[in-house]
């Protein structure tokens, strides 16, 4: 079944299924706290947290039985071992978060902070 077209980030969250809503709303809150200067933008029909002109920090994705917090594959490769050590499945750039498990907030906040540090280091190299 194709994903419904969303008009905005708020519309994305409004269209979530009941089982999806708690995890994704928690991820949204965590994202806004971790990166207060980031903009929420709808890209690829999904919420993306963006800084500077167009740097994507991370993206939220919803699926039938899980959601994902997605980063660039290059960045996530440096974090994948910590995700797997915490007992969560991962792939090329994402941590898989089943709806029937509690969100690993410490792990997710750590990933977000690491991505922000990675971004700050990359922009410092350009100066």
Describe each model-derived feature in a short phrase.
Residues 1-127:
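Charge-dense, helix-prone N-terminal extensions
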